Amino acid sequence: MADSLIEHWPDELSGLFAFEVGFSGGLDSVALLSLLCEARARRPEIGLSAVHVHHGLSPNADAWAAHCQALCDSLRVPLRIERVHVRAGGGESVEAAAREARYQVYRRSASEVIALAHHQDDQAETILLQLLRGGGARALAAMPALRELAPGKLLWRPLLEIPRERLEAYVKARGFAWVDDESNLDTRYRRNLLRHDILPRLERALPHYRSHLARAAMLQADAAAILDEVAREDLQACRTENGLDCGSVLALSAPRRRQTLLAWLDALGWPAPEPGALLEFLRQAEYAERGASPVLRLRQGCLLRFADTLQAWPKAQSEPPASTALLWRGGDAQSLSEWGGELAWERRDAGVPAALLESGAYLAPRRGGEKLSARVGRREVKDLLREAGVPPLLRRRWPLLYGADGELLAVPGIAVSYRAAADGGWWPLWRPARP
């Protein structure tokens, strides 16, 4: 197997010499570490190390770490042991939280390449699990052999074409011991249910199921790559300064609309929503009445239709401050991170006089019942915001401009007090920050 590993060394790894093995001490990672030690013997330029992630979830965790240290010492491989605290929250499973903790450790590695020991059986299990979850082409492409883990760092899975039984024979032939995680026997976990109950029966009926599933994953990876390419082109064509042009998005076919929004979310670093929620948002965006603002709420923020654009707004980290003093600098914009935006200025025929802005003006949030002086009577601020098409989600963080005496001078970007306005004055413009 070491000969095959060296023969099929990926071109993408040329010129990279610092390799770190994710080392649990189980059969698979023992096999990978041994194989890379053999490769190191033939290619001395390879720098090899290992990392063991101590999750602290098993009473045997300390013993596993000690086993890993002993084996690495015998193979003359430097080992670092990283202890992590696994916290599952928001409906996340302990298994998923532990996986994320491991990958955080891998991302912090000083090595250029992180090598993991996933094999052909793991790949088959992953494909079936994704299928049972209703995954699309990207999910069914399963685990790639090589991908970027972090800037300047690659994740490599060199064993994906090798079944577990071959790895077991290899490890036994070399006399290595390995540890068994007792949680791998718990069939309450779906992967273990597949591994111990379902796949053995499938193998009896279809002995070559692993290679067939691997081929299916390869085809799905090709399909996913084409989808991504088209989605990136559509996304670029639909982009505007403020988000996506709604008309351009809705001119696409329904599948391309969905893929464009998924590509947009991916570019923002936001996870994909449930397919049904995305479909409903697009339906509402297409048929919403003028002035309506359909919203798709996500953990990181929300997507919404605002006038003729689709916009992404990050979730506010805190309530706006009770008040913020205006720092008047002769029309220079003022960045207001605590409000989530920037206050800019334009000279207009009927704007706020500079004298009022220089003498104690301040910003404050809506509290309800505010009214602004108009040509005839006074207008309620809530009506001005609604008529301007400001989505309800943004109204509570839309700052109002007051004079030192507490008089409402302006709703930035929307209206200026008729009573306070003067020729050659200044119009405040509110520019909410976007991700």
Swiss-Prot record:
Taxonomy, superkingdom: Bacteria
Keyword Oxidoreductase belongs to the record: no
UniProt keyword Cytoplasm present: yes
Assigned EC number: 6.3.4.19
Chief localisation class: cytoplasm
Keyword vocabulary terms for this entry: ATP-binding, Cytoplasm, Ligase, Nucleotide-binding, tRNA processing
SMART domains on file: TilS_C
Any Pfam family hit: TilS_C
Gene Ontology CC: cytoplasm
Annotated residues for binding of ATP: S24, G25, G26, L27, D28, S29
InterPro entries (UniProt xref): Lysidine-tRNA-synth_C, Rossmann-like_a/b/a_fold, TilS/TtcA_N, tRNA_Ile_lys_synt, tRNA_Ile_lys_synt_N, tRNA_Ile_lys_synt_subst-bd
GO biological process: tRNA modification
GO molecular function: ATP binding; tRNA(Ile)-lysidine synthase activity
Cystine crosslinks: none
Reactions catalysed, as given in the entry: cytidine(34) in tRNA(Ile2) + L-lysine + ATP = lysidine(34) in tRNA(Ile2) + AMP + diphosphate + H(+)
Family the entry assigns: Belongs to the tRNA(Ile)-lysidine synthase family.
Annotated function: Ligates lysine onto the cytidine present at position 34 of the AUA codon-specific tRNA(Ile) that contains the anticodon CAU, in an ATP-dependent manner. Cytidine is converted to lysidine, thus changing the amino acid specificity of the tRNA from methionine to isoleucine.
Name recorded for this polypeptide: tRNA(Ile)-lysidine synthase
